[in-house]
Design a protein with these regions (language model features):
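Short glycine/acidic-rich loop motifs that flank beta-strands on beta-rich extracellular proteins
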Residues: 64-67, 87-93, 110-122, 131, ...
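Active/binding-pocket-proximal capping segment
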Residues: 285-287, 294-309, 316-324, 339
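Short, T/G/N/S-enriched strand-turn elements that build extracellular solenoid repeat scaffolds
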Residues: 68-72, 80, 89-95, 134-139, ...
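Extracellular polysaccharide-degrading/modifying enzymes targeting complex plant/algal/animal polysaccharides
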Residues: 1-84, 93, 109-117, 141-263
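Short "repeat-start/strand-capping" segments in structured domains, especially the N-termini
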Residues: 73-77, 95-101, 130-134, 263-266, ...
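Short, contiguous acidic/charged loop-to-helix segments that flank catalytic cores in large enzymes
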Residues: 171, 253-258, 277-278, 307-314
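Repeat-solenoid scaffold signature
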Residues: 128-142, 185
Length: 341
């Protein structure tokens, strides 16, 4: 349910150029090998390549985790790891000091087979590390979602309980260590408001707070028109934060630190190809993308943004992108033919 739908020509080598967010909402088996698919957009027939008998269809059934998971680790090196199939992420990295090195990682369809996809989610997904990954001499392809996605979290102010004391909702921990700075941004406009230094952090366990957090997404959606997802149980905590000075902020303003932002991510000499969504989704500051090739990417080769909906950030400030090659990019929207990133 709610999985993306992908269509290939009969040879399995050419994905039909279409928007990748046409999702399957229901599947009805009509018998005699006939299946009726209900989708959100219904635009499978809008592309300039015909969808006809003989075409092959993929409906990934995504699960959590990855074929290879690296969690709460630091300065590990994975050399020449080849991943041919994963029910979730190809490689999943979360938490810890980070700075892990992936040299010669390949996410590809198993050679000499007729497989269509190599993973049912992002090819490489990294989040919440103190230092981001170093991906070198690698190849990522045929993932169901972004080929590479790296980010920290967007936390938010739950309440202002004193001139320099806040209650903060952290997503998978909190994005600031004691002694580091935090930036505040307006909930609606995302305009910068203030900066302060964190002097104390205390994790709270009040069940009333935890239950109230579940209602925040619907409240700010109705009151402010800002759409964010409901945080699933086990993915958030409440913190009391003390700052070094007063700040002029409001409840639900964004609380942005970089302690767990996967900063200093390095991506070099890597081949990104045949991605039905984006090549690199970059949200980690102080990062480098260099000497890479992007080919046959349905959406942007490199997409730099934050996501309020997914609570993913912070902002990829001080990002260096140089000496990369782009071939046949943004080819997944009907009627488009572009080599721009």
């Amino acid at each position: 349910d709610n999985s993306r739908l992908f269509a290939y020509l009969a040879d399995g080598e050419t994905v039909l150029r279409k928007h990748p967010n046409d999702k399957v909402v229901n599947v009805n088996h009509l018998g005699n090998k006939v299946v009726e698919l209900g989708t959100t957009l219904g635009n499978l027939f809008d592309g300039d390549v015909p969808f006809e008998p003989g075409c092959r269809v993929v409906i990934p059934l995504r699960t959590s985790g990855g074929a290879v998971s690296v969690e709460n680790c630091g300065e590990c090196t994975l050399k020449d790891v080849h991943i041919y199939s994963s029910p979730g992420f190809g490689l999943y990295e979360q938490g810890g000091n980070g700075g892990n090195v992936y040299d010669g990682l390949r996410l590809i369809r198993r050679p000499n087979t007729n497989r269509l996809h190599a993973s049912s989610a992002d090819g490489f997904h990294s989040k919440g590390c103190k230092t981001g990954p170093r991906l070198i001499n690698s190849e990522l392809s045929y993932a169901e979602d972004d080929l590479f996605n790296v980010h920290g979290s967007l936390d938010y102010v739950y309440d202002v309980i004193g001139k320099n004391k806040l209650l903060v909702v952290g997503h998978y921990g909190i994005s600031t260590d004691v002694g580091t700075s935090v930036d505040f941004y307006d909930l609606e406009s995302y305009e910068y408001k203030d900066t302060a230094t964190v002097t104390a952090v205390t994790k709270l366990s009040d069940t009333v707070y935890m239950n109230n957090i579940k209602d925040v997404s619907s409240f700010i959606g109705s009151e402010y028109g800002v759409t964010v997802r409901t945080m699933p149980d086990g993915t958030f905590d409440m913190y009391e934060v003390t700052l070094d000075r007063d700040v002029d902020i409001l409840p639900y303003d964004w609380y942005i630190g970089t302690s767990t932002s996967s900063k200093n991510t390095v991506i070099k000499n890597t081949y990104f190809h045949d991605g039905p969504v984006r090549g690199i989704l970059m949200r980690a500051p102080d990062s480098v993308i260099e000497d890479c090739t992007f080919e046959n990417i349905s959406c942007s080769a490199i997409f730099v943004c934050l996501s309020r909906y997914w609570y993913e950030g912070p902002i990829a400030n001080n990002l260096t992108i140089k000496n990369n090659v782009f071939k046949n990019i943004v080819c997944g929207v009907p009627g488009s033919e572009s080599s721009m990133a």
